[in-house]
From Swiss-Prot:
It comes from Phaeosphaeria nodorum (strain SN15 / ATCC MYA-4574 / FGSC 10173). Disulfide bonds: none annotated. InterPro entries: Cyt_c_Oxase_assmbl_COX16. The gene is COX16. It comes from the Eukaryota. This is Cytochrome c oxidase assembly protein COX16, mitochondrial.
Length: 116
């Protein structure tokens, strides 16, 4: 009975292993034993990841909902009715000739636009 250090070469055991038989068959049928499982893994992974990507986009849509123009302006049902005649008379009643020009305060170091 041979011991752990037998004189039999390592190469002599290779033709009987599963890996050696697979390598030999791979040379005869490369697509069937390598390409087809690879492509099947890619397609199966795509189907498996579809719910995860859908969840990602649903979360994004929940966060960024489309709002109407009224909601963006903060207007709800408390809006007053607008009448063009009333608005015209209201603007006519304002005194637009009594105004004073004021300079805008500038930040420190910001040019104020004057040439001095």
């Amino acid at each position: 009975m041979p011991g752990p250090f037998s004189s039999r070469s390592f190469a002599a055991t290779l033709p009987n292993s599963i890996a050696a038989r697979y390598r030999k068959q791979l040379q005869k049928h490369p697509f069937l034993l390598f390409g087809l499982p690879f492509m099947a893994t890619i397609v199966a992974g795509s189907f498996m990841l579809t719910p995860a990507t859908a969840l990602r986009y649903e979360r994004y849509d929940r966060k960024n909902q489309q709002i109407t123009q009224e909601e963006a302006m903060g207007l709800r049902q408390e809006r007053r009715k607008v009448n063009m005649k009333d608005e015209y008379y209201r603007l006519q009643a304002k005194d637009l000739e009594d105004w004073e020009q004021r300079r805008v305060k500038r930040l420190p170091g910001e040019p104020d636009g004057t040439l001095v």
